[in-house]
Amino acid sequence: MIMSKDEYLITDAPLKALTVFAMPMILGSFFQQIYNMADSIIVGQFVGSSALAAVGACAALTNVFICVALGAGVGAGVLVSRYFGARDYGKMKTIVSTSLISFLVLSILLGIFGFCFSHSMMSLLQTPADILDEAVLYLRVYFVGFPFLFMYNILSTMFTSIGESRIPLVLLIFSSVLNIFMDLWMVAGLGLGVFGAALATLIAQGISAVFSFLIFLYRMRRYKCQFEWFDGQELYSMLQIAIPSVLQQSTVSIGMMIVQAVVNPFGTQALAGYSATMRVENVFSLIFVSIGNAISPYISQNLGAKKIERLKKGYHAALVLDICFAVLAFLVIESLHNQISSLFLGKDGTALAYQVSGDYMRWLGYFFIFMGIKMATDGVLRGLGIMRPFLIANMVNLAIRLSVALICAPRFGIAFVWLAVPAGWLANFLISYAALRKSWPNEEDKGAISCRKY
């Protein structure tokens, strides 16, 4: 039987294994946000707050399409991890091939759709007229490179599903550094403005995606076995997990677009402040997302290997990591929120922009712990393949956030856009945890565990 050096998720002590696995993913999330924030910081400093607002206005919409990629990767990743843990490498490679072919086609279709309807979508979001043209330009360049972004996210999920989180980190560092230098050259040097920022991101992401694909192909040569290039039945099994995850992630992002539409009427400066803190929220939230993404393959691999006793220990290890990072987030935001806001808003930012950014940021800092425990619990549910309560919990989270923003913010002020966020996280956790307590497999379940569906 083939043995793999990546099997530490099913052999090492749970806290050690999860920490070793999660840390590159956390660092990767940090560099992913540097990669994203480079556009905002450089545009804000060298072009102005209106250009920053144009880039920020695109964030909620681009997140919808990114979440489709991430959700699609979840379906493939859970099954790849399960077969990897069971050492059924033929099925594992069939899932990999089937998902890459299917999602490449999907990414091209989504890119064409996004490019053609960029103006219509930004108009529906009530984007302020003074930044609409720049926002549409940024968005269209983004969609030209969308297949690269989509496939890079799928490949990153594939790497982590087999216990490899270092290669995505190295590629992210490379693309982040490249993106920053190209941003400075195209925006500050050549004066290309929003177009230059978008083009720099496209080129850096494209190079990273190509390298990811070549390295992953080489990595798969380690597992010498027969497999099918495309299997409709495995695609169906994958979609049973992927579709709820895509619905959850894309619906939440659509909800954020609706929230953005609530913010937009408050004006360009309020939008600039909101956009600045959204970037900061993404930095810290992706730390917790990374821990949740790390626990999913841990759970799935150990389930495939029928090591039931390790599941709860892994969940507890994830909670420990979440608590540590929640405390760190609070300390950083409480101490440096003004300086962080100035990175994005620059000298052109008004008092309103700084107030919106600071108030939103400090409120989040108090309650990131709720996001952390929510993400860990959701990650365990994904690893077990229990998607219905996972979807319901996230929809409740979204409903709370949307209802308060839509009803209260227009009447009582922009602060109500973010006041309900922690309540949504907490409700999500409670629903997910209740479902998890009912669904934990035990030692008596070993014989009934299937690699296709738990």
Go through each PLM region and give its residues.
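Short alpha-helical transmembrane segments in multi-pass integral membrane proteins
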Residues: 1-22, 80-145, 189-243, 299-366, ...
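Residue-level signal for short hydrophobic patches within transmembrane helices
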Residues: 11, 15-34, 38, 61-68, ...
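Small-residue-rich hydrophobic transmembrane alpha-helices
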Residues: 52-112, 149-168, 273-337, 371-385, ...
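Interfacial/gating helices of multi-pass transporter permease domains
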Residues: 20, 43-63, 129-134, 194-195, ...
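Short runs within selected transmembrane alpha-helices of multi-pass transporters and secretion channels
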Residues: 73, 142-160, 168-176, 197-210, ...
